[in-house]
């Protein structure tokens, strides 16, 4: 969030040294991301990381994948993947169309506002109306944000798109995580650590491959890919809502 703001004050200096002032902004973000990752990994049960939840078959005593927990984890990962690829590619695109680093900072600020502005009340809202309604609403918002982002040359629309992208992500993340937490209590295990570890790795993969992908297919291609993933997410949220969500 503060990367573009901090860099904006010295953008000409950084551009002369590194060729692009965005390099420093991304570097600041990468350091914060890695520090957060190390903290999470250091404070969690290592045996739970990157392991899909399993259950024991009562008839054969063999373990098999826990279908509900696995499906919820996949939905959570796809939701995060859609958000990350568009969020991380937008600063590159905005600079490519000739806008300043200050505009990049404003767009990311709008996005962050969408991600967290309703967080203090969203958990209670999920408890009141149910995770099913909240997640399907989030799926629609996420898809609308991707469609808005297809209008790649309009800066005002990009501000709206990134705000909705954060908002839809937040609706889905809170509602699906809430369902995973309830299922964890039911199964007497910590499924949140497992699901969050997959979200973290998915985020690393999406961001680390972004440069090459952006070069190959451009911002429009990434947005189309994100739109298809958002359609997949919404379709499965609707299709599986009666089985997975309350």
Question: What kind of region is each of these model predictions?
Answer:
Residues 88-104:
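Short amphipathic helix-loop junctions that connect adjacent transmembrane helices
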Residues 65-86, 163:
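Pair of pore-lining "gating" transmembrane helices in MFS-fold secondary transporters
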């Amino acid at each position: 969030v503060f990367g573009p703001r901090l860099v904006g004050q010295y953008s000409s200096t950084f551009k002369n040294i590194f060729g692009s002032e965005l390099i420093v902004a991304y570097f600041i973000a990468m350091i914060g991301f890695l520090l957060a990752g190390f903290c999470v990994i250091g404070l969690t049960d290592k045996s739970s990381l990157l392991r899909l939840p399993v259950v024991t078959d009562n008839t054969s005593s063999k373990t098999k994948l826990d279908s509900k927990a696995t499906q919820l984890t996949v939905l959570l990962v796809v939701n995060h993947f859609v958000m990350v690829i568009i969020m991380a590619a937008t600063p590159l695109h905005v600079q490519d169309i000739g806008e300043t680093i200050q505009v990049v900072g404003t767009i990311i600020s709008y996005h962050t506002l969408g991600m967290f502005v309703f967080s203090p009340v969203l958990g209670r809202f999920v408890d009141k109306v149910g995770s099913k309604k909240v997640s399907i609403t989030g799926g629609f918002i996420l898809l609308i944000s991707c469609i808005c982002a297809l209008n790649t040359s309009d800066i005002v629309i990009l501000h709206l798109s990134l705000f909705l992208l954060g908002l839809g992500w937040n609706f889905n993340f809170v509602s699906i995580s809430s369902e995973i937490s309830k299922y964890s209590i039911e199964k007497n295990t910590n499924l949140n650590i497992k699901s969050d570890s997959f979200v973290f790795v998915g985020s690393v993969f999406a961001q680390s491959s972004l440069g090459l992908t952006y070069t190959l297919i451009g911002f429009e291609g990434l947005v189309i890919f994100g739109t298809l993933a958002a359609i997949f997410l919404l379709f499965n949220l609707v299709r599986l809502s009666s089985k997975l969500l309350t």
